[in-house]
Amino acid sequence: MRVVFMGTPEFAVAVLRQIVEAGWDVAAAYTQPDKPKNRGMKLVPTPVKEYALTQNIPVYQPQSCRDEAVLEELRALEPDVIVVAAYGKLLPQALLDIPKVAIINVHSSILPQYRGAAPINWAILNGEKETGVTIKIGRASCRERV
């Protein structure tokens, strides 16, 4: 199974690590561009970039996934599956149509509750006693409370 992974924060690293440990062929990791941080405004790589490089996975950091050149680059990777976990931006339909088999979205809440950004933070701020993860494959969803 040829996979392209898309994610940015530590939550996404946990998902990517499971894919790597399962022995899937990870063709590339897409993540947000490095951002300047701290007083020196030094560019800091995303957690996904740092992990992917330790696994010799090619890393792509496009400004936008709506750019036709980025979509062509992704098509050239010929993914069977694209796995998305906390990528950080909405993905265009043209990208969702690229994988041969499916696009899999891993979201850190039980959808539809806390859809969008920072679902774990919102669950904590709202004092939730339990939360969970939703794994969406194409149009189907699997939810598990934790």
PLM feature spans:
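One-carbon transfer enzymes
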Residues: 1-145
